[in-house]
Amino acid sequence: MSVTAERKAQIIKEFATVEGDTGSPEVQVAILTERINNLTEHFKDHKKDNHSRRGLLALVSSRRSLLDYLKKKDEARYTKLIGALGIRR
């Protein structure tokens, strides 16, 4: 259900801008996307889980804020990131 430590390390390695980078917007958005995808799969079986759905909306909002920040600061990095993650915008 949640993102395992191994999967998180793999995501960090893939999207990090420098070695040991865990706080860049790219890494944060990638981890949030993984969590959002996991929750989306959860809702296919548990349609009435409104408590978790509220958490999903919070994750989507956080991701949107980070993406808006990245687009404002560096549009090339933003475009590359949404292409790599398959996020439509």
UniProtKB/Swiss-Prot annotation:
Keyword Ribosomal protein found: yes
Any one Gene Ontology molecular-function term assigned to this protein's record: structural constituent of ribosome
Keyword Nucleotide-binding recorded: no
Gene Ontology CC annotation, any one: cytosolic small ribosomal subunit
Alphabetized UniProt keyword annotations: Ribonucleoprotein, Ribosomal protein, RNA-binding, rRNA-binding
PROSITE patterns, per the entry: RIBOSOMAL_S15 (PS00362)
An example Gene Ontology biological process: translation
NCBIfam families from the UniProt entry: S15_bact (TIGR00952)
Subunit record text: Part of the 30S ribosomal subunit. Forms a bridge to the 50S subunit in the 70S ribosome, contacting the 23S rRNA.
Similarity comment: Belongs to the universal ribosomal protein uS15 family.
Alphabetical list of PANTHER family matching this protein: RIBOSOMAL PROTEIN S15, BACTERIAL AND ORGANELLAR, SMALL RIBOSOMAL SUBUNIT PROTEIN US15M
Function of the protein: One of the primary rRNA binding proteins, it binds directly to 16S rRNA where it helps nucleate assembly of the platform of the 30S subunit by binding and bridging several RNA helices of the 16S rRNA.
Protein's name according to its UniProt entry: Small ribosomal subunit protein uS15
Organism: Rhizobium meliloti (strain 1021) (Ensifer meliloti)
